[in-house]
Amino acid sequence: NKKWYDSTDVIASISKVTYDIVNNVSPNTENHYVPHAVQDDVFKKLPKDDVAGFRADNMGENGKDKMIFFWNNRNARRKQSGTLALWFSEFAEEVGPENVCLIMHTDPKDVHGQDLEAILHDHDYDDGRILISREKVPPTHLSMMYNMADVTVNISDAEGFGLGTLESLSCGTPI
């Protein structure tokens, strides 16, 4: 890639490996290490008792034994929110909708997305298998939501680096 590195004014390397490669292959090219990051004092594995209390406060007795899936994205077409609702509902029918819950943390009526409330209502997905979390919350609350989830779901088309993926993994929640 030397010819490409040499033809570039500035390279922003998102990993130390890339930074070292560029520096070795093309030492005269301006190269900056700019890692993706989240607040590691906020997005981290939290104490189980705190998470259990948060889950009880937010999911109630009904959510105690459910497997929780978490989706935290803008409700934009490329994030495929409506498709996710369909796929999750099909999965819920296979395992029993009383056993699983998808929490979609998003604006359900984003002008660049789909009307999630209408989709849930029109397809009878509004029975508790899919919940919408629409309020803007501080990062500490969001971290608790990642910790409460058993798994984070992240599908999209033409994605950037995936901030939600990094936040979730930082909290110890698999994607």
Language model features with spans:
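Aromatic "clamp/platform" in nucleotide-sugar-dependent glycosyltransferases that forms part
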Residues: 157
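Short alpha-helical donor nucleotide-sugar binding micro-motif in glycosyltransferases
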Residues: 5, 144-149
